Amino acid sequence: MTGSTPSSSASPSSSRPPSASRRSRRRTVAALAVLAAAAVTAAFALTLDDADNREEKAGEPAAVTASAAPAPADEGLLALARRDASDPLAIGRADAPVVLIEYSDFQCPFCGRFARETKPELLRSYVDKGTLRIEWRNFPIFGEESEQAALAGWAAGRQNKFWEFHDVAYGKPRERNTGAFDAENLVAMAREAGIADIERFQADMASDEARGAVRADQEEGYTLGVTSTPAFLVNGRPILGAQPTDTFEEAVETAATAAKTANTTEGAGR
């Protein structure tokens, strides 16, 4: 299982939690309090091989050790699903029985692997059939280009082109912090994604609203204990790194079955 950790050259906002955002959603306050007490270590931190990470060369992909058994779902984590039908950074029915939350960085090579190899399978097998909803969270950890790419993704969403931009950005492996996500290339990606109003795209990228939205996503991830990308929650069950596709399929199937059982039990109790 593999993921990426920030390099030592990452900007301060990408290497440690940003300050509290006024835009943090009130609906998750109680859930995050639960997470701070229990899920932070149980959900993500214990899946990291801390010793290996300390020995690793800065900027190289972080080795991740899988748990012997799947981590259980957590009620606080379940509450993080936004289920906002108008969210342009989400795909799938808002009332889908399973929600996968993804914390990713556009410069993360393992996020790219997930986007190219696993996500298309999940879309075909579960999203298109109404079983799964995928909600994106911007989690830039590799410096200025990561942050600019996150802002660009948010701006693309303002014109309902986030997923098109996502597919272009992850369309091929790109070297980190080499200009692949500089201003000129981000505009080129926006054009390729079919974004019509480039001036609006650039203005949205530079807006305080964009920075606030990205910061709120980062804060959510940091509160969970996320330190590398990609990281996922499948109906509250944590998965860290670019696991094989069947790992995600198993998680979705298990979550869908549990949701169906819960609905049946709830209906019988009425």
Regions found by a protein language model. Name each.
Residues 1-63, 68, 192-270:
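C-terminal cap of thioredoxin/glutaredoxin-like
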Residues 81-98:
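A short beta-strand-turn-helix
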Residues 85-88, 119-121, 217-220:
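A generic local structural motif
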Residues 89-91, 181, 239:
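Short clusters of hydrophobic/aromatic residues that line enzyme substrate/ligand-binding pockets
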Residues 96, 104-107, 112-191, 270:
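Structural alpha/beta surface segment adjacent to cysteine/selenocysteine redox centers
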